[in-house]
């Protein structure tokens, strides 16, 4: 299993991956000098976009007007065309009034299809929905990392948020470590918003919205789903329910760990090479599953070449849903279907052909960061 060595921004780590495919848009645009004047300390302050200034006291109730608007946005986005800045503002305000009422541990019923990292690979996201079935016919659970690295983070996160608002009980979007103000400044989403909108306003809206994403989900009280992994400060799922998630991802602590940690072959807790979170061994995952009467921990956060990988004697599964990650890693992607009887099936798929790009077979990566 390969570790995607994202690190907290305070460590001053720059992007480690050099794209080898020719694109009109560079992955990170390499335009920090031009963008420097656009950024200020205020950009890191939660709530600066104003999307949550007038939160509702009850969940959003869809009416015909809302439904028609959402359907138009989804149709527009399905063509890989970004929404206008005004429409992003409207969408994010609606999404706040859905997400703020979801729990830290979102209960999910079976059947459900569980998905890993997407990372701005919009055409591959559409392929995912072809493989797994359209929403709302299929009940989906996404485990975070919708933005950064890929070329279409704006369209990807807009599409998933629009689907969430349109079908709030048929799609769940958890927070990943990349749904963060600090990480998105380093790995592409911030620059993409500047490039496509000419300002940081859309970036502010979405990063404010990320604070409201639930951080874990529990499928039929048996499968614990989250982006990263376990925390030495969390022994029970009830402790996750008590966390204050409406904030920027902290640099340390239990919320940070849930979004950053990784399983490891070594037992116990270890220092993570990422600089945030921990590594945890089979003894830790077995004890957590036993304490909480779980059958499985499902998580994302790491590239796995076949799209999924078991660890810790099948106490943990990693799911990765971005094929040919960063358009060069040569991996397959996968999603995991869980049926009414808790039977699990993995559906693997290769990258979708992007418009204007020739079809190429998967290749072995030269290296991985």
Curated annotation (Swiss-Prot):
Q: Name one Pfam family in it.
A: Metallophos
Which EC numbers characterise this protein's activity in its record?
A: 3.1.3.16
Cofactor(s) listed: Mn(2+)
Query: What keywords is this UniProt entry annotated with?
Result: Hydrolase, Manganese, Metal-binding, Methylation, Protein phosphatase
Q: Which gene codes for it?
A: PPH21
> Where do the TM regions start and end?
none
Q: How is the cofactor bound?
A: Binds 2 manganese ions per subunit.
Summarize subunit and interaction data from the UniProt record for this chain: Inactivated in a complex with phosphatase methylesterase PPE1 (PP2Ai). Interacts with phosphatase 2A activator RRD2, which can reactivate PP2Ai by dissociating the catalytic subunit from the complex. Forms a ternary complex with RRD2-TAP42.
More about this protein? Present with 5620 molecules/cell in log phase SD medium.
The family note in this entry says: Belongs to the PPP phosphatase family. PP-2A subfamily.
How is this protein named in the record? Serine/threonine-protein phosphatase PP2A-1 catalytic subunit
SUPFAM superfamilies xrefs:
Metallo-dependent phosphatases
Kindly state a single biological-process term from the GO annotations of this entry: mitotic cell cycle
Q: Which GO terms describe its molecular function?
A: metal ion binding; protein serine/threonine phosphatase activity
Q: Which residues form the active site?
A: 178 (proton donor)
Q: Which reaction does it catalyse?
A: O-phospho-L-seryl-[protein] + H2O = L-seryl-[protein] + phosphate; O-phospho-L-threonyl-[protein] + H2O = L-threonyl-[protein] + phosphate
- UniProt-annotated binding residues for Mn(2+) 1: 117, 119, 145
Q: Where is this region: Disordered?
A: 1-57, 348-369
């Amino acid at each position: 299993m390969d570790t995607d060595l994202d690190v907290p921004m305070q460590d001053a780590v720059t992007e480690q991956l050099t794209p080898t495919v020719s694109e009109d848009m560079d992955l990170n645009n390499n335009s920090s000098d031009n963008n420097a004047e656009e950024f200020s300390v205020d950009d890191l302050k939660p709530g600066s976009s104003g999307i949550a200034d007038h939160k509702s006291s009850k969940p959003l109730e869809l009416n015909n007007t809302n439904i028609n608007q959402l359907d138009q946005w989804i149709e527009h986005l399905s063509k890989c065309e970004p929404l206008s800045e005004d429409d992003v503002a409207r969408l994010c305000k609606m999404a706040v009034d859905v997400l703020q009422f979801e729990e830290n541990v979102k209960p999910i019923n079976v059947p459900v299809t569980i998905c890993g990292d997407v990372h701005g690979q919009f055409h591959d996201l559409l392929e995912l929905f072809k493989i797994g079935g359209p929403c709302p016919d299929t009940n989906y659970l996404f485990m975070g990392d919708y933005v950064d690295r890929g070329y279409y983070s704006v369209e990807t996160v807009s599409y998933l948020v629009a689907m969430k608002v349109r079908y709030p009980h048929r799609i769940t979007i958890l927070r990943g470590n990349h749904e963060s103000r600090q990480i998105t400044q380093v790995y592409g989403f911030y620059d993409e918003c500047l490039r496509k909108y000419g300002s940081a306003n859309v970036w502010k809206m979405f990063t404010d919205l990320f604070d409201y994403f639930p951080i874990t989900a529990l499928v039929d009280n048996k499968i614990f789903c989250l982006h990263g992994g376990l925390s030495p400060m969390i022994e029970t799922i009830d402790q996750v329910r008590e966390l204050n998630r409406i904030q920027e991802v902290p640099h340390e602590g239990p919320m940070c760990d849930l979004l950053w940690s990784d399983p490891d072959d070594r037992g116990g807790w270890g220092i993570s090479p990422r600089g945030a979170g921990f590594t945890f061994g089979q003894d830790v995952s077995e004890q957590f599953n036993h304490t909480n009467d779980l059958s499985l921990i499902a998580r994302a956060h790491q590239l796995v070449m076949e799209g999924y990988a078991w660890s810790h004697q099948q106490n943990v599964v990693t799911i990765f849903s971005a094929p040919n990650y960063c358009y060069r890693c040569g991996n397959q992607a996968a999603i995991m279907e869980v049926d009414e009887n808790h039977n699990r099936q993995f559906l693997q798929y290769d990258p979708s052909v992007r418009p204007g790009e020739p079809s190429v077979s998967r290749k072995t990566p030269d290296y991985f960061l």
